Amino acid sequence: MKPFLRTRVYDGPVRAVVLDWAGTAVDHGCLGPAAVFVQAFALHGVEVAVSEAREPMGSEKREHVRRMLAMDSVAARWRAVHGHVPHEADVDAVYRDVEPLMLQTIAAHAVPVPGLAEFVDRVRGRGMGLGSCTGYTGPMMEVLVPEAARRGYSPDVVVHASEVPAGRPYPWMCYLNAMRLGVHPMESMVKIGDTVADMHEARNAGMWTVGVVRTGNDVGLSEVDAARMPPDQLAARMTVAAARLREAGAHYVVDSIADCFSVIKAIEARLARGDTPYPA
């Protein structure tokens, strides 16, 4: 690929797409990690709500524990049980349970979301690179990647939080995707995710960002449960989730990955007009 020289605004096509994993590409509802965090805290005698477990979703998993323990509600319960406010040793203690629990359960949450295969085919049919990144660690991805591949999903690049100095909201995983895909500039890339952390990461990387809601963390429903929920209730959940992603900086918000290729075409039209993904 010919290097882009930044003496002008980039007005070419989208060159690559970077997908989040749980809640975006696989694991409808981001159910796997949410359940693990609830269970890990329970092992330490502290009950946490699923909503509390979901709040920092998208973060590197140790940081996820740290952010949960920093919540006033969780910290108060921790103090009531353990007699002290949470500190770094407590982060380590909870995380020591998170890692094996994730490794035990992650394979069951490798099912691609509806529409992923068709989206991947269209992206590759256009010659775009297909990257991915995740708050999961290296050992977790050693389980998840082959399980997803067995079900038909194999991105060109996989970057996990263990490979970079800091996970989301820092942009390093997106930059590493760009390096491995050989793609530049960053505004020729689109990040698709389902969490606030995804949106912040992409914005910090100077990428276009697309939020997905129906399959994502904030709606938090399996494919079956989403189909069974009364339409007005599901729509209300999705409206709240969409607003949260927009507030976090999403350029576009859609129901799921199945709706994302039309967004890529819309982004290309904006690029051709000289638009950029970052504020002036």
Curated annotation (Swiss-Prot):
Domain of life: Bacteria
Active site (UniProt): 20, 61
Listed cofactors: Mg(2+)
EC number: 3.11.1.1
GO BP term (any one): DNA repair
Catalytic reaction list: phosphonoacetaldehyde + H2O = acetaldehyde + phosphate + H(+)
Protein residues bound to Mg(2+): 20, 22, 194
UniProt KW keywords: Hydrolase, Magnesium, Metal-binding, Schiff base
NCBIfam families from the UniProt entry: HAD-SF-IA-v1 (TIGR01549), phosphonatase (TIGR01422)
Subunit structure and binding partners: Homodimer.
Main function: Involved in phosphonate degradation.
The protein's name: Phosphonoacetaldehyde hydrolase
Encoding gene (name): phnX
